[in-house]
Amino acid sequence: MKPLIQVQGVSQRFSTASGEFLALQNVSFDIYEGETISLIGHSGCGKSTLLNLIAGIALPTEGGLLCDNREIAGPGPERAVVFQNHSLLPWLTCFDNVALAVDQVFRRSMSKGERKEWIEHNLERVQMGHALHKRPGEISGGMKQRVGIARALAMKPKVLLLDEPFGALDALTRAHLQDAVMQIQQSLNTTIVMITHDVDEAVLLSDRVLMMTNGPAATVGEILDVNLPRPRNRVQLADDSRYHHLRQQILHFLYEKQPKAA
């Protein structure tokens, strides 16, 4: 199977007041169509830097990245990003926030009526059809993230990039959105790359977990295959010995092999 995303010998340096800082060193891995990949590691290990490189928001100092066998040289609609901060424009309705992305990508290929139907379809997909005409200040944090996901999906991306999208949410809202992401991935076969600090979230959602070494000069230390059948049910997994074994492997890497500095 041909990889959809290829990260090839990537290093990333930054100039700082105290000199050059090597954030990532010689990072290489492939991501295949329909996979859900989690990036996990301690703060400062370069997870967001790596996601920004895949998004094309930044370019690597060394090495290269490919999406569908084309060089990633900047942002593109085939790689949609959802940040922890929903990034919705507060003066626009939920519908209009999604419309900004849809109009930019599909203005020439869809009629105005088709774009309207597509926007509504994607908001319905994340259970936000009831809030089309509400502004961000009128809805909850979890609902804002749903609109952000709808906006990303409406671009018809090949890859959905999630930068700790549930980190600021309460536990129940977080669980509902995790379930929504699993349902979307299953129905659309979307390729997902997600940053998380949550070990349980990584095991629940992922096909593979990329565990990052501590920075500076961080790299992928180990890759864990999550061979749990889908669809996954969090209640059933709580009693599954395989789930607990996978969880323990991640914890062992993070706190035994890569202990966080005090």
Curated annotation (Swiss-Prot):
UniProt-annotated binding residues for ATP: G41, H42, S43, G44, C45, G46, K47, S48
Domain ABC transporter stretches: 5-239
Location of the protein in the cell: Cell membrane
Membrane topology: Peripheral membrane protein
GO biological process terms, semicolon-separated: nitrate assimilation
Annotated Gene3D superfamilies: P-loop containing nucleotide triphosphate hydrolases (3.40.50.300)
UniProt superkingdom: Bacteria
GO molecular function, one term: ATP binding
Record key words, sorted: ATP-binding, Cell membrane, Membrane, Nitrate assimilation, Nucleotide-binding, Transport
GO cellular component, one term: plasma membrane
Pfam families membership: ABC_tran (PF00005)
InterPro entries: AAA+_ATPase, ABC_transporter-like_ATP-bd, ABC_transporter-like_CS, ABC_transporter_ATP-bind, NO3_transporter_ATP-bd-like, P-loop_NTPase
UniProt KW Protein biosynthesis keyword: no
Job of this protein: Probably part of a high-affinity binding-protein-dependent transport system for nitrate. Probably responsible for energy coupling to the transport system.
Family in the record: Belongs to the ABC transporter superfamily.
Listed name of the protein: Nitrate transport protein NasD
Organism: Klebsiella oxytoca
Taxonomic lineage of the native organism: Bacteria, Pseudomonadati, Pseudomonadota, Gammaproteobacteria, Enterobacterales
